[in-house]
């Protein structure tokens, strides 16, 4: 698919993966690294403003990556990182202002919904909890499957369930976590996850729920599981690995290829559906 959500998810996942790779290899940042991180961060911020907090992941890059014999050079590199983040924020906000007038879901009732949230934060928090408790299972399944072909097809539940299980198993039980992060970095990642999660829910509450005429509605509508795919990847980073270096490890590729093979029936169904 070449839809906007796919592009946005790819950019967000690439940003997370690239930064984690820098941490894992612990290599010194080069000019090309700053360029790549800056460009991808701006793409993420422009694609969906709710993913803007992901750009703050740049701050978990350890000081070893900024090593230099001169303290002034280290300071300059830190300043460049801060500038990249600020540019992403500014560009994202500017584009939001420009594009907001072209949103098909824009509605005068959106302002009323924003006022409701500001005037009744506790009630809105209850609405968030209620929505999560009701829709959590659907979101979990929708992250790795769900409706396709404009609602004409749906991934088989066994395939979705097994895929979700394999992903968690591969993340937490297969091998020791290679990326070591400090407590402050994990706290920052958690805050990024939480803020992004709330922004996703709030954006849909202001746009889709308000558009349906439900000012102060009890449930948030219009949320799809794929919106959480990028931040879903942050969870295994925060959680401790459930294996130690002495445990017998399972080849991660075995599970990875199993997940890919599970998608073959879905791909065949799409082909057959398009042929007919």
Model-derived regions, located:
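Short acidic/glycine- and proline-prone juxtamembrane loop motifs at membrane-interface regions
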Residues: 1-8
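Hydrophobic core segments of transmembrane alpha-helices in multi-pass, intramembrane catalytic enzymes
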Residues: 8-16, 229-233
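Perimembrane helix-loop-helix junctions
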Residues: 21-28, 53-86
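Membrane-interface alpha helices of multi-pass inner-membrane proteins
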Residues: 33-49, 54-60
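Hydrophobic alpha-helical membrane-interfacial segments at the cytosolic entry of transmembrane helices
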Residues: 35-41, 70-97, 187-195, 257-262
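Membrane-lumen/periplasm interface segments of multi-pass, membrane-embedded glycan/lipid transferases
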Residues: 92-176
